[in-house]
Curated annotation (Swiss-Prot):
Biological classification of the source: Eukaryota, Viridiplantae, Streptophyta, Embryophyta, Tracheophyta
Gene Ontology biological process terms from the UniProt entry: allantoin biosynthetic process; auxin-activated signaling pathway; brassinosteroid mediated signaling pathway; cold acclimation; exocytosis; export across plasma membrane; negative regulation of lateral root development; regulation of auxin polar transport
Membrane topology type: Single-pass membrane protein
PANTHER family: BPS1-LIKE PROTEIN
Induction: Rapidly induced by cold.
Family membership: Belongs to the ROH1 family.
One family name in Pfam for this protein: ROH1-like
Tissues in which the protein is found: Expressed in roots, stems, leaves, flowers, siliques and seedlings, with highest levels in roots.
Family matches, as InterPro entries: ROH1-like
Organism of origin: Arabidopsis thaliana
Protein name (record): Protein BYPASS1-LIKE
Length: 382
């Protein structure tokens, strides 16, 4: 669906919904006064439109869907939405403490705490990918184009390729990968200044445990997530809508991270659906459907992560492994040229990982700390 198509499928805005409510009341009362949108209504509608525009942009770049660069853009979009949502909560904090907003905002922050464990699990997955990068380095070094290729070099490359293939097995087939999760510390140990946050969040102390399940965590994040009831929208002066919006965006972002990056007990079976009358529903559901289709591809069904770079390194290393198996000595010129070509391909994949993982990890860390800060500020202000 082209990005321009979403412009016509924005759905009904918060302002139009509010106008309908006002029009209904004026018909009952017999009044014909024209309703002018308040500053608050304009602010809340602007937030809905911003979320929609962010996801329209992500659809426009969906040729790079699930690449490190694309997921980085998704995280940037989340951070922008989170900052706008934080401003809305701060600007209307007097209403946040009243019913039904006290219940709705508390529910949002409870879900956001669950997202912290997902961020920690993704950090573990990044470390796992770095181990694969090191194994690719061994293969590249062993088959260096500046030296003649001998049997010893092939054996060294072959061993690294076998280790890489084993490491890239889905953890259901190879559960030893979960050792990373037990060993790594979480983002929250970087600074001690957020002492109150550390007291509030167990997720800040250590990374996820060996028994932790990404699939179950996503299900917990999605549990009982429902569109705001009309009476809650009215009683909260519309504030229930951005809370639902931000909760849905949070769930979608965490779902994408689990889909893309290796982590314990991956699973994408989450009931995620947004009614089309929300401005941002069409672009979000379009991305959701594309990712589900990608996960159903025959060659991706049992992979450890849908990240584009993982697919590339898996294919490149498999082709290299098959080539090495076909080599007999003495090595003829054609085979030597073919080996060099495969090495060059592996170098490109390795460089993509090397250049992309660090910025990606920094963004995941920023998401983690932004969620913590938002929750802490809420505790301080309520």
């Amino acid at each position: 669906m082209p990005a321009t198509d979403f412009q016509g499928s924005f759905g009904r805005s918060l302002l139009s919904l509010r106008r309908d409510q006002v029009d209904s009341s004026t018909v009952v009362s017999g009044s014909s006064s024209h309703h002018e949108p308040s500053t608050m209504e304009v602010e809340l509608d602007s937030f809905q439109r911003q979320v929609a525009e962010k996801f329209i942009d992500l659809n426009a770049s969906s040729n790079d869907l699930l690449s490190l660069e694309w997921i980085g853009k998704l995280l940037d979009s989340f951070l922008c939405c989170q900052e706008e949502f934080r401003a809305i909560v701060f600007n209307h904090r007097s209403q946040i403490s009243k019913s039904p907003m006290d219940r709705l905002i508390s529910d949002y922050f409870e879900r956001s705490i669950k997202a912290l464990d997902v961020c920690n699990a993704i950090r573990d997955g990044i470390e796992q990918i770095r181990q694969w990068e090191k194994l690719a380095d061994i293969v590249i070094s062993a088959l260096d184009s500046h030296r003649p290729i001998g049997e010893g070099q092939l054996r060294r490359a072959k061993k690294a390729l076998i280790d890489l293939a084993i490491g890239m097995l889905d953890e259901k087939d190879h559960p030893s990968g979960t050792n990373l999760a037990h060993r790594n510390r979480s983002f929250g140990r970087v600074k001690d200044s957020h002492h109150r946050s550390i007291g509030h969040f167990r997720s800040l102390s250590w990374s996820v445990s060996r028994s932790w399940s990404a699939s179950k965590q996503l299900q917990a994040l999605a549990s009982n997530l429902a569109t705001p009831r009309p009476n809650d929208v009215v009683a909260s002066n519309g504030l229930a809508v951005p809370v639902y919006t931000m909760t849905s965006v949070l769930l979608f972002v965490m779902w994408v991270l689990v889909a893309a990056i290796p982590c314990q007990d991956r699973g994408l079976q989450v009931n995620f659906f947004v009614p089309r009358h929300f401005q941002w529903a069409a672009p979000v559901m379009s991305l959701h459907d594309k990712i589900v289709e990608e996960s159903k591809r025959r060659d991706r069904k049992n992979c450890c992560g849908l990240l584009k770079e993982i697919d590339r390194i898996e294919k490149s290393s498999r082709l290299m492994n098959e080539l090495i198996d076909s080599i007999h000595f003495p090595l003829n010129d054609d085979k030597e040229v073919e080996v060099k070509q495969r090495v060059d391909e592996l170098v490109q994949v390795r460089e993509a990982l090397r250049n992309g993982l660090d910025p990606f990890e920094r963004k995941v860390r920023e998401v983690f700390h932004r969620i913590v800060r938002s929750r802490t500020e809420s505790l301080d202000s309520l």
